[in-house]
Amino acid sequence: MPSLNDIRSTFLDYFRRNGHRVVESSPLVPRNDPTLMFTNSGMVQFKNCFTGLEHRDYTRATTAQKCVRAGGKHNDLDNVGYTARHHTFFEMLGNFSFGDYFKSEAIPFAWELLTRDFDIPREKLLVTVYHTDDEAASIWKKVAGLPDDRIIRIPTNDNFWMMGPTGPCGPCTEIFYDHGPSIWGGPPGSADEDGDRFIEIWNLVFMQNEQHPDGSMTPLPKQSIDTGMGLERIGALLQGKHDNYDTDLMRSLIEASAHATSTDPDGTGKTHHRVIADHLRSTSFLIADGVMPSNEGRGYVLRRIMRRAMRHAHLLGAQDPVMHRLVPALVRQMGAAYPELTRGQALIEETLKLEETRFRQTLDRGLRLLEDELDRLPEGSPLPGEAAFKLYDTYGFPLDLTQDALREKGRKVDVEGFEAAMAEQKAKARASWSGSGETKDAAIWFDLAERHGATEFLGYDTEKAEGQILAIVAGGVDTASATPGQTVQIILNQTPFYAESGGQVGDTGELRTDTGRARITDVRKGQGLFLHFAEVTEGEIRPGQGAALEVDHARRSAIRANHSATHLLHEALRRALGDHVAQRGSLNAPDRLRFDFSHSKALSAEELATVEAEVNQFIRSNGMVETRIMSPDDARALGAQALFGEKYGDEVRVVSMGTLAGSGKGMDGQTYSLELCGGTHVARLGDIGLCVILGDSASSAGVRRIEALTGEGALAHLNEQMQRLAEVAATLKASPAEMVDRVKALVEERRQLQNEVAQLRREAAMGGGAAAEAKDIGGVKFLAQIVQGVPGKDMPGLIDEMKARVGSGAVLLISDTAGKAALAAGVTPDLTDRLSAVALVKAAAEALGGRGGGGRPDMAQAGAADASQAEAAIRAVEAVIGG
């Protein structure tokens, strides 16, 4: 029986033999489609190839693409664990043709793989085609010998594939497997098609049109093929199973869950184990691809999946975090096919453990609240939306988690009520995914790249060069010239200006032609082009002209120093904190650097000092900074760190810095820092000058941020600090060496004086004032006092003294400070069952025009804006006591 790993390999090997390039799975966070939350099909990374906006050095491709469907249009979360074939994470096997072959080859490829390589009996297969697609039907009859009754024509959109409201589309043919009459269900298109007898295993899309926003369709530049076959589904078939969760891979994760919770994998907790197994995959792969749990966007979807799995672990009786203990089982199954899983294992485990630990603090209380709410409702009534919102807002229960919990009890949620309470938050979430604005003007950059090719970057070796102006874009439109006052983007055939990427900001400088000048204010990338953002300062600039280009040298030098220091900082952090540290973002600007990295807690002062010292040690060593060009695989084999979120081509730049015996990295195994990086760097580490860490802060959940200065900026910062120290020393009339002791003495002296002042205030307050004698009100002694200028923080002590004076009774203290009142009330312990200080102080506050007040039955405080009615406040309290 083939394993899922075997099936994946068989698929890819088949298409490799048939001239296809095996392309790595793209990340779950789409690189080229801002409208998608997660990659949800194999064709996502090839979308621009289908539309003709992107060309690659191959026209046939095959992939095993990791996908997530849990949020937005494609959302399988609610059904996961309860059905045989729903998943949040799945693998999509696919083969693709970009204007190479079409139906006449795609159909034979599919038939041969299924019937020969996978050895599926021919008589078990049937297909559907779009009702007008006579060509596909004819090919199926010719290639597979299928009779007409096993080639079913479907007139609905089930056989016309569209990625969304816009984009590539076309008719498709779906291949089904017939499990036989012992399983209920009818063929596709019949009234009983929802049964499990006929299961779709492969969808072949004949990509021939593009759908536009106005509803019209135009032919694609070239006819293409996009196919998709779920690995879990074909795996179940080839392993003789009717349930994806019974395949070898899923079964191993289910058994790991059962072992970790000491429960039966097939007992009453079967559904819980299935949810955990599925969600373990989606959460682990999302974390490996850089998504961290948060309260918005992708991070919120990740958190929802995590918490759903954690609730099911809780229902299995798990008292401690479980999910992180299952990661090794997942890595054993899938780490070979997806190395990023192995590389990120430590971070995945730490993130899962931290999130589960946090959620468990509120899970029990939230579930108790849910039970209490249900107990108050009539049998079968839905949970009010307000209660569901409270579970979300107070206990961190996403709505679908509450729905999942109620599902087991046959209950539902008043979703409309919940949505009303969540309106503001949902508006923010929608805004987060309304698109980045890149889509509408991307076509012009594709068009220019098609016409002119990519910009050649010369800036590794020079800061001055000449280039030819290929195009000028103003307001998203290709224009014939630019004049003073205009802000435009200029495209050149080559440039020394670095375009913003990898955390390094774009260069600035000057462009000169025979007829004009422009100030370059920024440079960014778009479809391989370097977009020079320019303000024309004099004359006229036109496409076709030659241009002299000069980068701002001082600014570039400062950026280089910061970028190189970032590499040293990354390695020093890994050595100080552990290999789980991975870059999650950076900013290398001329005036500062910022480095975001995966780590779950704040760095101590000692850890920061250790990291800073190590960075400066290597700066002082003044070692060479070397760059080599090699393949990504060779770079990783040498131990190079890849920059998070970057897409690498067939060749990469590998930057090495410093020497460290026994590091195991680099050509000699003794390189300190080794990273894949396309940025600009210093020639020698000594060129950085100095690195000063300003501090460490939280960037997001599980991500820390360090900010630092280098070179002249670091020196200026230290000089400023020294100047401040000198000013403080002069103020203290102490030498720098004596400053600490002097400050400590002043702090202690201040503390003593504050205590003395507080004591004097208490003595002055207790020494007299209006209503200073206790009254007897209905057998209760009541002592009220009006004082001047006593701060609220001193009043509890005075209340204690007043209670001591009366022995048994109630007391009230009103302090008048610039016309505003601070109030405190007290009740001796023997009377708190009859009187509450909270009620007394609220009555006094209301008499003074205030509201509220709070505390304990024996002591409470409040405030009010008008102290002039203090006597009325006393009378109000007397009324409460006598009432």
From Swiss-Prot:
The keyword Zinc applies. It comes from the Bacteria. Its EC number is 6.1.1.7. It catalyses: tRNA(Ala) + L-alanine + ATP = L-alanyl-tRNA(Ala) + AMP + diphosphate. Its main location: cytoplasm. One of its GO terms (biological process) is negative regulation of DNA-templated transcription. Binds 1 zinc ion per subunit. Zn(2+) binds at residues 563, 567, 677, 681. It is found in: Cytoplasm. Belongs to the class-II aminoacyl-tRNA synthetase family. Consists of three domains; the N-terminal catalytic domain, the editing domain and the C-terminal C-Ala domain. The editing domain removes incorrectly charged amino acids, while the C-Ala domain, along with tRNA(Ala), serves as a bridge to cooperatively bring together the editing and aminoacylation centers thus stimulating deacylation of misacylated tRNAs. HAMAP family: Ala_tRNA_synth_B (MF_00036_B). This is Alanine--tRNA ligase. The lineage of its organism: Bacteria, Pseudomonadati, Pseudomonadota, Alphaproteobacteria, Rhodobacterales. The gene is alaS.
